[in-house]
């Protein structure tokens, strides 16, 4: 029974929940992080999105079960290995998704709508759209941005269009980082195409150019936001916010260099959670925001 529960938990891929931390961004930026009610709503939103993602992971694993059995590492997944049955997977996915959308409905209608849109795009991406060149990275950026929008509606704060534009550009860049890293490793293996993705090793340079450009545009958007007179009115010492710009600029540059070296073998957001340098940069940004307040 214990092993069964462990496999059921593994099938939900809880390590991927870290991506949903973005839901807390609006809470932090609106200075409501000391409001117990807002914190509770943000935590519920995080749980709803995480369970939605887990339910979709299970559905995707059931869909790809035969392909996973032929893969050197994916064949060890709970469903591909046979440790969990298809019937178990279907039941687990239904239960998890029902709980997820029940939480979303409890929060508020706007949050529920965003979560439904997220689920539709995520499912479409997993089943087919991830094979379409460039559309795949665009959809990944949209999925990350939807987490921020969902967080905004969860805690009922005003939607910042500066934040949305910044999010689109930076997450497009990070999505391309992952693709470029895959292409680099593919080249080392003597292969030319990414299976089921539509990319070839010859796309490496153009993807790098577009991805790094998108990342640096996100820094420009951030700089314009800080320079905006309306932003200055919200802070006692807005000049300290400029500490954020070189921090993000350095981080994006570093991520791209690691990708070119083939050292970015996971989702950049997941990478950041385990990267000491990223934590130092986050601390530096936090100091800048604190001094600005």
PLM feature spans:
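Long, highly hydrophobic alpha-helical transmembrane signal-anchor segments
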Residues: 19-40, 129-161
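Multi-pass membrane catalytic core of lipid/isoprenoid biosynthesis enzymes
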Residues: 65, 70-115, 161-172, 208-215, ...
């Amino acid at each position: 029974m214990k092993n069964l529960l462990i496999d059921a938990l593994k099938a939900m891929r809880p390590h991927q929940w870290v991506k949903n931390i973005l839901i807390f961004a609006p809470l932090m930026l609106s200075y409501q992080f000391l409001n117990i009610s807002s914190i509770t709503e943000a935590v519920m939103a995080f749980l709803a999105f995480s369970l939605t993602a887990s339910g979709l992971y299970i559905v995707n694993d059931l869909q790809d079960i035969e392909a996973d059995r032929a893969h050197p590492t994916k064949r060890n997944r709970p469903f591909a290995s046979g440790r969990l049955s298809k019937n178990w997977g279907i039941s687990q996915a239904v239960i998890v998704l029902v709980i997820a959308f029940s939480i979303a409905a409890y929060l508020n209608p706007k949050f529920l709508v965003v979560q439904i849109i997220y689920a539709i795009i995520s499912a479409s991406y997993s089943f087919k759209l991830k094979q379409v060149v460039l559309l795949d990275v665009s959809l990944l950026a949209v999925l990350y941005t939807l987490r921020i929008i969902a967080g905004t509606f969860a805690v009922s704060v005003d939607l910042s269009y500066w934040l949305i534009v910044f999010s689109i550009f930076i997450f497009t860049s990070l999505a391309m980082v992952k693709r470029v890293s895959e292409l680099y490793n593919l080249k080392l293996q003597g292969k030319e195409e990414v299976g089921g993705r539509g990319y070839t090793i010859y796309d490496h340079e153009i993807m790098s150019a577009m991805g790094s450009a998108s990342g640096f545009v996100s820094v420009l958007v951030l700089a314009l936001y800080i320079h905006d007179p309306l932003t200055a009115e919200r802070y006692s010492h807005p000049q300290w916010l400029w500490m954020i710009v070189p921090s993000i600029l350095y981080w994006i540059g570093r991520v791209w260099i690691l990708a070119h070296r083939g050292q970015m073998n996971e989702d950049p957001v997941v990478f950041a959670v385990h990267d000491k340098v990223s934590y130092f940069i986050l601390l530096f940004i936090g100091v800048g925001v604190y001094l600005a307040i």
